[in-house]
Amino acid sequence: MAFLEDGNHTTVTEFFLLGLTDDPVLRDILFIIILCIYLVTVSGNLSTILLIRVSSQLHHPMYFILSHLASVDIGISSSVTPNMLATFLVKQNTISYIGCSIQFTSAAFFGTVECFLLATMAYDRFVAICNPLLYSTKMSTEACIQLVVGSYIQGFLNASFFTLSFFSLFFCGPNRINDFYCDFAPLLELSCSDVTVAVVITSISAGFITLTTVFVIAISYSCIFITIMKMHSTESRCKAFSTCTSHLTAVILFYGTAIFIYVMPKSSYSTDQNKVLSIFYTVVIPMLNPLIYSLRNNEIKEALKRHLGKKVFSYGNLFCKTHYNHNYPV
């Protein structure tokens, strides 16, 4: 039941997601592609977390933050992808009122945390390159924990603002959302009540997060580039810059896509283009992050080789012992 009679009012109890396409063949193809991406996302980020936990050489502030970034990437993808895959299977694109609020609230929470973690990693690179002698003090274990906890608190606050704004709205008419998941902007268009307060509150919250994190990232990298340009040897410049390329790539992908979705005027691109960008933002980027950080980071690659080598060596020893005992019993 999509509507509930409440006295003289009709209340929406569920929303209908128009999804990505109506073509049944294309839906099946998209299901397979997105399922594969989701499996790679979860396995890749879990592998990153486990590798950082078990590798003593990766027990540094940057990798501590990276492990939380990997957890958040799983959260962002999981807030949208499982429900989207389910709609592909059951051919039923409805989501309950509460389910809709949970979906966009979790997306807002994890998206906010990712913004602050990316800003924290930029600050980490700034201290490492511009103030290396103070690195152990400014990026101590206690400082890292405080920065990460602060990121989660900001995520909780922003998600709370969006949740309270959502429950202050009244839905009595159309319930069709032209998207594949419950985003806050399309919900505002469906509301029968005045959305001014909700728009102001969420805009201030999202604006504060965006401006704060972009400011920290911009200032950090400005100082980093100035410091790198002052280095005398080309080798030192390349080495310093190589420590930033992975993070800078992740920042450009994340914020670049977010700007197109939430900042650019809707008239500048079509709804279908917006859906593609949203897929990239919520599904593809969480898969790319572990690849970006692992393929361009020598310490992670060395740790991965070392642990894979140990596994191969231990399995080889086990095979040899089994083979020896089988052929030459005592």
Curated annotation (Swiss-Prot):
Q: Which GO terms describe its biological process?
A: G protein-coupled receptor signaling pathway; sensory perception of smell
Return the Pfam families for the record. Answer: 7tm_4
Q: Where is the signal peptide?
A: none
- Membrane topology label: Multi-pass membrane protein
Family matches, as SUPFAM superfamilies: Family A G protein-coupled receptor-like
Membrane-spanning segments: 29-49, 58-78, 103-123, 137-157, 200-220, 241-261, 275-295
Q: Which Cys pairs does UniProt list as disulfide-bonded?
A: C100-C192
Q: Quote a single Gene Ontology cellular component term.
A: plasma membrane
Which residues face the membrane's Cytoplasmic side? 50-57, 124-136, 221-240, 296-330
Give the superkingdom in one word: Eukaryota
Q: Which UniProt keywords apply?
A: Cell membrane, Disulfide bond, G-protein coupled receptor, Glycoprotein, Membrane, Olfaction, Receptor, Sensory transduction, Transducer, Transmembrane, Transmembrane helix
Per the record, the similarity remark reads: Belongs to the G-protein coupled receptor 1 family.
Name of the protein in question: Olfactory receptor 5P73
Organism in which the protein naturally occurs = Mus musculus (Mouse)
